[in-house]
């Protein structure tokens, strides 16, 4: 039974379909919640319309990119089309396009539910914190269940229909490339609006957040959806697919060597159980009448983790799977939780780092920036150690199994860490839903009590969002280490037909080709981040000029005349146009750099390139995500009445810190882990070409 991979494929498909049915039930539950406030309904439709318009335009641009990429893939991958059988190239192209479609669907599903749940959550807060929390959480869970169900279904179908792991890498590349551009575009949109709204509204005019007089306020709320919902959904979809693809590449290679299909079966078994555990975790998630939303979200994550550990242990025993592989996957899962806890410590407004940055803000914005940068760098150490220990422990646990099992252990550690991604996405999507709900409550005049409730929910969302971003980056770290193993596996398979080829087991950093690749690879995340943040910079300056124009030219707007409304659509247009203009160059730079390094230095240079890219990318991603979350929550801590409260000099300094942190945590930081995955997949897909056609090989 343990060698019957088709059994576990069938189970995976069944569990995927169950997750879709559960997502539909959750969607209908949210839709049934009462909503009667006319002002909230009107503003909610503006947000929904803006988000759908942006997504349509973004996907139109990305469809052109995907079409061009599909032509190149057909011509050159897995080998030039004129050299032999054309069928593998057709299969690879279809797999790539399927990956882009699944990834795009993840973003679209997220937008649809988030722009319904935000209105329902705002009005539910009139009944208390419990119903409002459940509405926001279940709205996020629709996306969690749909995205992970799509992942498992997509990988299962590609594996079953093609019986080819290279096609899985093509599917993963499709998901990753679209996720890279979607995350970059959404991040530029959301932070353009957020920075502009904060600088003009809070710093210059001293008006509250989400004040309807601010022309950028609707664009800001649209940005929460296109960046934090659609972008993060595509991002975690991509990480999950990549971890399974890397594990299956090595599993199939091992199965060929030892006979049977036990290792492939293990990957599908654990992935299906992870989704089942997330379904149970979401279904049982509750918060007491006067409970703490942060505690409720974290408790659901811990429950899901425990369910996965128990069920996989039972499956390993019952089906006679390898216990060492189970150990590797559990290590990955536990380290994921630890990375989340570390991110929580540095970003939670009840912990010392946030208080220290708030205290520093009393002395001015320079000290806000300095303290935030310092704590951001310190926060990288626990996560980097965690990723390193997870990889090392998984490697050593599986080493006695021999052959390629140590690297397979690392791949399964990544699968384990991402096993509860259904719950992680649910928690992550909850954040922007309740953030929108808070804005709608203020614009809909629901009163101070409702604002207090939505502030509490929003604070929990910010804390959990920092945790989920740390988790996503940690998972990407293990995934790309596994993809490095998959790259070596692909190179050795391609080299087997070349006379005199010596199989690769590792890379020597004293080899100048490896060192060349390492230096270039390490620089890419920094340049990539800079390009995205400069995009936000340029776009925000255009929007700030537009906001100034409206306050200057529209009579009664600044004074709050109830009969005067800003031209919200102008700011949405600026954010959309700028994001679409800026989203392609950074991603294209990363992909082209990989290809150039490969053709110049060969597979040795690519090995160094990936190593440098992984280390520097993880460090920067963790630093930016945690520093940005720290500045954001320090500002909110001051706004809650500490260190002088709203309007104080400390508050103005904290707003400056938050403005710097916004593109850190919501544009560049979360996009880096997708960039690392994309270049790793490009390397694996083009390994044959790099092996035979490099300049200095």
What positions do the PLM features span?
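Hydrophobic packing and interface segments
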Residues: 1-697
């Amino acid at each position: 039974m343990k060698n019957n991979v088709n059994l576990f494929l069938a189970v995976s498909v069944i569990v995927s379909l169950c997750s879709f049915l559960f997502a539909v039930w959750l969607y209908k539950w949210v839709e049934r919640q009462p909503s009667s406030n006319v002002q909230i309904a009107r503003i909610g439709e503006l947000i929904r319309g803006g988000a759908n318009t942006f997504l349509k335009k973004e996907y139109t641009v990305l469809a052109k990119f995907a079409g061009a990429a599909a032509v190149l893939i057909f011509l050159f991958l897995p080998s030039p089309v004129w050299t032999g059988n054309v069928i593998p190239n057709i299969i690879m192209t279809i797999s790539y396009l399927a990956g882009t479609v699944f990834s795009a669907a993840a973003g679209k599903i997220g937008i649809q539910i988030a722009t319904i749940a935000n209105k329902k959550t705002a009005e539910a807060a009139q009944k208390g914190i419990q119903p409002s929390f459940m509405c926001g959480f279940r709205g996020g869970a629709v996306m969690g269940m749909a995205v992970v169900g799509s992942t498992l279904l997509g990988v299962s179908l590609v594996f079953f229909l093609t019986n080819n792991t290279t096609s899985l890498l093509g599917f993963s590349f499709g998901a990753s490339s679209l996720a890279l551009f979607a995350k970059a575009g959404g991040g530029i949109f959301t932070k353009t609006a957020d920075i502009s709204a904060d600088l003009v509204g809070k710093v210059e005019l001293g008006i509250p957040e989400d004040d309807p007089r601010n022309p950028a306020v609707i664009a800001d709320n649209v940005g929460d959806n296109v960046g934090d919902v659609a972008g993060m959904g595509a991002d975690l979809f991509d990480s999950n697919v990549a971890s399974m693809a890397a594990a299956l590449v090595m599993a199939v290679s091992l199965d060929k060597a030892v006979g049977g299909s036990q290792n492939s079966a293990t990957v599908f078994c654990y992935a299906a159980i992870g989704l089942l555990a997330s379904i149970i975790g979401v279904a049982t998630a509750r918060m007491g009448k006067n409970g703490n939303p942060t505690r409720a979200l974290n408790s659901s994550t811990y429950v899901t983790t425990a369910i996965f550990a128990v069920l996989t242990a039972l499956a390993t025993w019952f089906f006679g799977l390898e216990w060492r592989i189970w150990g590797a996957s559990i290590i990955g899962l536990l380290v994921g939780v630890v990375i989340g806890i570390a991110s929580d410590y540095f970003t939670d407004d009840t912990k010392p780092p946030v208080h220290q940055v708030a205290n520093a803000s009393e002395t001015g914005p320079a000290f806000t920036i300095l303290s935030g940068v310092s704590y951001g760098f310190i926060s990288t150490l626990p996560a980097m150690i965690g990723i390193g220990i997870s990889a090392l422990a998984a490697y050593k646990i599986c080493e006695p199994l021999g052959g390629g099992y140590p690297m397979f252990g690392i791949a399964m550690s990544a699968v384990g860490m991402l096993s509860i991604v259904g719950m992680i996405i649910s928690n992550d999507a909850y954040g922007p839903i309740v953030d929108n709900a808070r804005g709608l409550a203020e614009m809909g005049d629901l009163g101070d009590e409702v604002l207090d409730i939505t502030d509490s929910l929003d604070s929990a969302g910010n804390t959990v969002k920092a945790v989920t971003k740390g988790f996503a980056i940690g998972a990407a770290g293990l995934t790309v280490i596994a993809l490095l193993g998959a790259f070596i596996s692909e190179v050795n398979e391609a080299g087997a037909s070349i006379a005199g080829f010596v199989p690769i087991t590792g890379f020597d950093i004293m080899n100048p080709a490896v060192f060349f690749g390492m230096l270039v690879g390490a620089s890419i995340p920094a340049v990539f981040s800079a390009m995205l943040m400069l995009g936000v910079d340029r776009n925000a300056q255009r929007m700030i000029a537009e906001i100034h124009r409206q306050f200057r030219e529209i009579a009664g707007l600044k004074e709050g005349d109830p009969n005067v409304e800003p031209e919200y659509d102008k700011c949405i247009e600026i954010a959309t146009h700028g994001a679409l203009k800026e989203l392609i160059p950074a991603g294209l730079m990363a992909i082209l750099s990989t290809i150039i390094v490969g053709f110049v230095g060969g597979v040795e240079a690519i090995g160094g390139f990936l190593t440098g890219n992984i280390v520097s990318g993880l460090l920067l991603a963790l630093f930016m995500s945690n520093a940005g979350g720290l500045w954001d929550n320090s500002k909110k801590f001051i706004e809650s009445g500490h260190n002088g409260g709203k309007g104080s000099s400390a508050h103005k300094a904290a707003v400056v810190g938050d403005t710097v942190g916004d593109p850190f945590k919501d544009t560049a930081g979360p996009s880096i882990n997708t960039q690392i995955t994309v270049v790793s997949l490009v390397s694996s897909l083009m390994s044959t070409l790099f092996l035979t056609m490099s300049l200095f090989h």
